[in-house]
């Protein structure tokens, strides 16, 4: 539930559910989930990157928690087949929340420092009749290294390879 705090992103200034929070990257929603779920134990359970939350929960996106693209893919594959033993309906809900188009799933992430987008992620998977293709793209720079830019690059690569047929 939104606590009334005014954020610079209008979509954040309302109650959220998983789908709306995923679509609008509502950080406060996920920070609340992290607090409620005991995120440190959870990260250890799924072996997520270096599992280091010493930088705090509100700044973990650009802080001490680090993960490589290969580790992201390993985590995503394990999630996809539910190696972690989550409730099936929860796995399904997350997959539905990150579905971009039929058979194409992904989530962006952007790390900002002093208002500059310095770390962009786009991770996900694409399904066809015979295969599942997992991907994780990370771009870094002094500015304009956003999740949306990472998504543009990933879509171009996946399209060029004939894995997806997607137009934004």
What is the role of each PLM region?
Residues 1-2, 60, 121, 125:
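Tryptophan-centric aromatic hotspots in well-structured domains and transmembrane helices
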Residues 25:
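Acidic/His-rich structured neighborhood in mature extracellular/periplasmic domains
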Residues 21, 43, 94-98:
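A generic structural signal for nonpolar/aromatic side chains embedded in well-ordered alpha-helices
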Residues 1, 21, 135:
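Active-site SXXK
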Residues 7, 35, 77-168:
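Structured C-terminal helix/loop/strand segments within mature extracytoplasmic catalytic/sensor domains
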Residues 4-13, 17-18, 30-81:
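Mid-domain, small-residue-enriched loop/turn segments at the edges of structured enzyme/sensor domains
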